[in-house]
């Protein structure tokens, strides 16, 4: 018997049966009213799901979710907010994992599937947010720009080898490029939300190197800066290819020297997370290996010291 059906039996059917039985014994003419009350209670239970969060993701089948809002971040970056079936629903996405989006694109021989990490979490019920940059050659990212409010997107998940758990290591170093910030933000927010001062137990130290081309390309900078300001164990080092005058962060590409200065040194309780454009990730794999970190595998596993999303 499923948890839901067991809950329904204990929460609705047994009390309802007792109500009907008691009414029949005490006053038979009130039985129709008791039946009506029972039907209403059962309907409310079925419709609301008991107001408990329901995980809606399915790892084997695509489901369609309705676009409810589009928030422009820049000329080519947008936050897409998709509604879940019920206001109390959650995606059910473990921290560190991602989802697959699928669409039929004109000119493509088969359905196109791409992976994205929501910037929202299961702490926010009723919807999920995707931060997406539209690339000229990006099939799904361009497809998303054509969606209108009320249109649907096919989603499947969760997927991915990374599942973050509190205190899985002492210190995490992160290197992100562009929209590669999304899985990092997911983990950063989860760690800070679970700090001892917030009633949790996560003491993991976090250091982030975030590389972009121009200042306007730094996604979610305001939120990242706010998180760093409130948490002394989270530090950010920004790197720009085209820095403005007076820039105090890094300049050019992320170098081994930057990694050595701003991220934790290799140790058994240290993990390095990478996410960004393929050329950047290739360079960062070589850089981390040159500094003594364990060589990154072609396909990362949870236990790897250097993990690539």
UniProtKB/Swiss-Prot annotation:
It is a single-pass membrane protein. It catalyses: 2 Fe(III)-[cytochrome b5] + NADH = 2 Fe(II)-[cytochrome b5] + NAD(+) + H(+); 2 Fe(3+)-[Dph3] + NADH = 2 Fe(2+)-[Dph3] + NAD(+) + H(+). InterPro entries: CBR-like (IPR001834), Cbr1-like_FAD-bd_dom (IPR008333), FAD-bd_FR_type (IPR017927), Flavoprot_Pyr_Nucl_cyt_Rdtase (IPR001709), FNR_nucleotide-bd (IPR039261), OxRdtase_FAD/NAD-bd (IPR001433), Riboflavin_synthase-like_b-brl (IPR017938). Its cofactor is FAD. The keyword Transferase applies. Its EC number is 1.6.2.2. This is NADH-cytochrome b5 reductase 1. It comes from Aspergillus fumigatus (strain ATCC MYA-4609 / CBS 101355 / FGSC A1100 / Af293) (Neosartorya fumigata). The lineage of its organism: Eukaryota, Fungi, Dikarya, Ascomycota, Pezizomycotina. The gene is cbr1.
